[in-house]
Amino acid sequence: PTPLDDLKAALRFLTREKPNLLKMVLLASALNFVVLGYGAVGYAFVIRTQWGFDATVYGIADGLISVATLMGMLIVTMMAGRLKIGHMTKILTLLGLTVIPQGVACMLSGGNWTRLMALVAFACIGDVICSCANIIAVPAIQMRTPDAMLGKVMALLSALAMCMQPLGQMAYGWAFDHLPAAAIFIASGAVLIAMALLSASLFAHFDD
C-alpha cells in the first residue's frame, strides 16, 4: 500500500471505530495551527519589527523560550503518571490564559524592555503548559489505537500537523501585517479557551 492508502485506512478506522480519537487528532491539529502560528510568526514580528530589537536580543528571547520548553518537557515527563486525559480542559484553559497576557504586554506603557520581559515570561509559562498537553494527547492516541493501525494513525497525525504548521504561519503572517499584535494574541488566547470548553465533554467521555 502507498502512504496515501495508509492515510485513508487510518481515516476510515478513526471515523468508523474511534470517533473520539479522530476528534483528538483534529484538536491536536487545530492546536498546532494556533500555537505554531503565534509562536513562530508573532514573536519574531513583535520583537524585531514592532519593538525594534536586534537579532541578539531576539536570539536570547527565543533561547529562553526554548529552554523553558525543554524544562517543561523534563518536568512533565516526571509527572506523566499523574497527567490524565481529564486534565486537558484545565491545561488548555491555562494555556489560553498565558497567551492573553502576551497581548496585554504589547499594550504596556513601560517601554519596550518591559513589554519584552512580560512577553517572554508568559511565553515560557505557556510552553511549559503546552508540554503538558503534548504529553497527554499523543500517548492518549497511541494507547487507544490497535497495534495494526498505530503506524497509520500516527502518520495521519503527523501529516495533519505538518499541514497545519505552514497554514498557521501564513494565516498569522497575514494577521500580523494587518491587525494589532495585541488583538491577535488576545484572540488566540480566547480561541484556546473556547477550544478547551468545547472539548470538555470529549475529555470527560473519551473512552465511552
Go through each PLM region and give its residues.
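Transmembrane helical elements of multi-pass membrane transporters/channels
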Residues: K23-L27, V41, T69
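Alpha-helical segments in transporter systems
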Residues: K23-V34, L157
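Generic structural signal for secondary-structure transition and capping sites
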Residues: P19-N20, Y38, K84
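Conserved extracellular-gate-facing transmembrane-helix segments in secondary transporters
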Residues: A30-A40, C130, Q165
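Juxtamembrane intracellular "pre-TM" segments in multi-pass secondary transporters
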Residues: P1-L26
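Residues at helix-coil transition
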Residues: T15-R16, V35, R48
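C-terminal transmembrane bundle of multi-pass solute transporters/carriers
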Residues: K8, Y43-D208
